[in-house]
Regions:
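Single-stranded nucleic acid-binding surfaces, predominantly the OB-fold ssDNA-binding core
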Residues: 1-98
Length: 98
């Protein structure tokens, strides 16, 4: 292992900030934005809190310069991490809306 490398067995959400939007037709299914910090070391901004017929979910930031398709800039590579992030963000969202 290179001296500049450090292995992390798992990532954990250590902080969540949520901005809740007032519902309105102009926002569509968007309910808010979230910023998370992983392991106190990596910040990810621009997570979208979305509503669908199956309930709330977290959408990941996309590249605004990609014209044809949505290109995600950040994606969890395991189901466990995706579920962990979604649970933390949606729990904080539910607390914020009371």
């Amino acid at each position: 292992m290179n001296t500049n490398e450090q292995k992390f067995e798992s990532l954990a959400v250590t902080q969540v900030e949520v901005s809740v939007f007032q519902q309105g037709a102009y926002l569509g299914k968007l309910r808010g934005f979230a910023t998370i910090i992983l392991n106190g070391q990596l910040q990810i901004r621009g997570l979208r809190i979305m509503d669908s017929e199956n309930g709330l979910y977290v959408g990941y930031p996309t590249d605004p310069y990609c014209r044809e398709d949505f290109q995600h800039m950040v994606l969890p590579m395991t189901r466990e991490l995706r579920e962990h992030i979604e649970n933390c963000v949606l729990e904080k969202y539910q607390q914020a809306i009371g």
